[in-house]
Amino acid sequence: MNVKELLQRYEAGETKFTGVSLSGVNLFGADLIGIVLNGADLHGATLIFAYLSRANLRKANLVGTRLSGANLNQAWLSGVNLNNADLHGASLQSADLRSANLTLASLLDANLMDADLRGANLSGADLTGACLRGANLREEKRMYTAKLRGAILQNVDLQGADLCGADLLKVNLRGANLRETNLREADLRGADLSGANLSSAFLTEVNLMGANLRGAMLKNVKLERAMLSEADLTGVNLQGAVMPDVRLNKAQVSGGNLSFARLNRADLSRTNLREANLSDSDLIEAYLARTNLMGANLSNANLTRAELSTTNLMGANLQGATMPDGRIHE
């Protein structure tokens, strides 16, 4: 089928074109709202600025397709192959992208608000500046797992997104908006989250080993049983964070704000907390073996039964702190 025939039949009211072969065609700016192209072969096609809202493209072949600026709002794209496709500036609001292949796709500045990306493979995709606010990337019954390994998500808006259990190994999330995002049990080992806003995010049992969180906003986050070994948290704001049983051993947290944080039973062995603010924090039964707390502010902190025998407290402010033996430091 050629472009002329497709457009003529569509304009005549026909919408179902299941399994058609349209590889390499030029449909620049075409109005194809609600068209049914499931299973169609559109690889290498040009669909720049095309109107494809509510279109059915399930399991279609869109490898290398040019879709920059296209309108794909509420489109059915489950199982579609968009490997190496150009979706720069495309609008995919409320689109169904379950189990879609978006590997190496360009999604710069794309609108993915409220999109369903469960099980989608975004490995190596470039989502710089994309908006994923309210998007669903959650793991459901271990059947769906969003794959974002190595993806570029710099400055993206993921506020409120569900990324529970997502594979985010070595992902670039610099400056990203992750407020109120659910990252429970997500794999963020070696990820770059420098300057990201994670305020009020759910990070229970997240793996952030070796991650770069320098200058990140982590105010009021939930980090129960999280793994942060050898992570860089220099200058982070963890004020009021809920962090019982967290593993922060060998992490860099110098100059960080951990005031009012709950760090009960936390592993802070060999952690660098030089000049950090730990005022009014709970460190009950915390493990602080060979921890660097030089010049740190521990005023009014609760250190009941904490392990401090090899801790470096030179120049630390302990005024009003409850010491391991229960006495109040003057």
Regions found by a protein language model. Give the residues of each.
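Tandem repeat scaffolds
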Residues: 2-330
